[in-house]
């Protein structure tokens, strides 16, 4: 601000930059990283012998990255108006490498080719799922939706409802209202949900836990695509029927 007041003290900064969670380190050129982990709100590692402090952020339509190399008195902030993390990584690494004396390389092409390959692999998986769903619909595969619809709760995420509207089944989160979409039969004990907001890129599996009578008493989730943003945390949810 105009008064140049510190947001936090040096002692608080040092505490934030202490490792709390260990993350495996990839010790390979050009950075030859020896340690990797998470502090209090910051990723911590070393690049070519220098401590690196960083974090990313994002909302729908933009992603950002902040990178600090204190020993070089270097700070890099990249703000974007798109959703591809490789963009800010390419910019950050290009600047960082110039300070570290690393020969320049074409990060844009490198990451473009890597993403293209990853997307092609992920697309095969998602296409198989939705092709199967379409075939099930065409073949009029019968599903006992009455035993599935109801209200379920995860202790962390809160309540969701599976309900029938005009012959279709819908998923609705109470706490996160945008997590809403139509539910389809995929395989025995396995439904899939297609979110109304396609920009999520996070359609998900619903795995059913049934009692002896065939009534669904629990639901677990998993993203269909391996490229789904990790922050959805579907794999950590464990819904139990409450109604």
Task: Locate the predicted segments by residue.
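Catalytic loop of the DD-peptidase/beta-lactamase superfamily, centered on the K-T-G motif
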Residues: 1-243
